[in-house]
């Protein structure tokens, strides 16, 4: 079978310019998803193209992804990234991945031993919020999670990311090997502390002495990641095949823009990512808050209200005058004033975001962005709302966004079509929706303390604003509610 590894590729395709035989698995990565392929792995590939070296990546997937891993192996661990801009495309073959392991194809034991190899310096992760097994209400390890329960009972055969990391670090310590840096690359707030809490929480349950050693010798840098990477579709894969002249089932499409801000705190070395444009900084938090509120908050706003209004893609929303105006107003009038970042022109940042959202070459589905809203809402919208409540400033679009989420998870769009709601709390949400009338819906969903905390449901100003926004959507539909809120 012909693959990108076995054919002569067209001249316009950018192939690796370095010696891949020199690569070692110095980075082990959890989660060979679309975002990682178009972001961290691609940036590492850029470093290798610039200066060579041995910073290869071993990709790990546990209980899914076996078909993707088999396909990756069949093409010598190469895959394609298509960067789609409004002005043209770039086709890139990424060669930074030199190995992959999967629990079904290989074994859990082989995966854990991979973490224990002497050359491993960084373990990076893109496993989504759910993968860290953290209780969102406390920020601590969720000891009621079935995988955590399993790992505490059988610690040498762990099934969770925290369990595997702790077991690997335990073995490295026993063998006299240096520890590795644990690098979360997930788009969640304070991701370095999230993974640190998960790992130390698991280690404390197993051995306080081990937890102390990890705390002293392992680093957990924070990161801010940014690139719009839609999930692969048959259509996007077919388009990439036309560029290549051969199929690549591991290929992914994305926008041209890319940003990675990384706390420069590594215990065993790192690639020279700054060569690829990565910003190595002392404190990631201001960058993270800017991105989560202005980009991700607006993305979620467009996803919920856009889906309800019948728009399938973010770029479709941006063709609509009201949605485009709302996105800009939300960013600059409601989200930007809540930030504390220096030396960044937030107006310019907002206009760049508008242009990225409007990119017609990207088909980023509103339904995809709307997934897992119960875990995204707190940092994307509610954090800014809390600041506005303290200042008594206007946050009417944020209120409409929260009400839009409530309407979306109620399971029916404005045309009366059923919505396939994907959320970690979907069972709980479904029960609350089924047990409440439209008039009671806001009160019912505000009982989700893991989303709204204890403070917001008890704040009469917050409750009143969300109820008013809900009534607007319920009475007029999402699009007209948006026009009413904007007064246009």
Language model region names:
Residues 1-488:
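Substrate/ligand-engaging "lid" and interaction regions
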